[in-house]
Each structure stands twice: as C-alpha cells, then as structure tokens.
Swiss-Prot record:
It comes from Rickettsia prowazekii (strain Madrid E). Gene3D superfamilies: Cell division protein ZapA protomer, N-terminal domain. InterPro entries: Cell_div_ZapA-like, Cell_div_ZapA-like_sf, Cell_div_ZapA_N. Pfam families: ZapA (PF05164). This is Uncharacterized protein RP756.
Length: 105
C-alpha cells in the first residue's frame, strides 16, 4: 500500500492509500488545502483543527447538495453511475478518516 505525503495549511501528513489512488489523494488534498486557505481568510485566528472541521463540514454540505441534485435528475435509475458516485464518496470519506487519525497522533 503506497504512502502519499499531503500538505495542509503548511503541515505535512503521510497517508496510506490504495494502489493507483495516489494522484487522486493528492488532488483531493490540494482541493482541501485550497478550501482551508479560503476559510482562513475569513477566520485568520482559527486553529488548524477548527479550519479542518469547517472545511470538512463545507465538503459534506456540497456532497449533500450534489446528491440531492443527482437524485432529482433521475440519477437513482442508473446503477453504474450510482456505483461510481458511491466509490468516489467512499474515497473521500476514507481520506478524511485517515487525515483525522493522523491529526489525533
């Protein structure tokens, strides 16, 4: 299982990921870091933990909105697309869980 080093708010974290998912994890980390930087502009004194919580909640809200839109557009009738979407959500959740575990250490 490969190890990927991601940097969030100038802090580096080493995470395990599935073979072939390295670029996906790095891309997700870049997007998360951008969101953290955006939040930090409006809350410059917030701790890294709080910034991460706020970014995670924003991501969850975006996922909920997109999920609702997909289902309103008949997404539930396409099992293949639903499986791909579920796989993507699982990858994101796994990444956030790994990051949370790293922060606990």
């Amino acid at each position: 299982m490969p190890i990927v080093t991601v940097t969030l708010n100038n802090k580096s974290f080493q995470l395990y990921c599935n073979n072939g998912d390295e670029e996906k994890v790095l891309s997700l980390a870049d997007k998360l870091n951008d969101k953290i930087a955006e939040i930090k502009l409006s809350s410059p004194t917030a701790s890294f933990d709080l910034l991460l919580v706020m970014a995670s909640l924003n991501a969850q809200a975006e996922i909920a909105i997109l999920t609702e839109k997909l289902y309103k557009n008949g997404f539930q009738n396409n099992n293949h697309e639903e499986e791909k979407f579920a796989e993507t959500l699982t990858t994101i959740a796994s990444y956030l869980e790994n990051l949370a575990r790293k922060m606990e250490k």
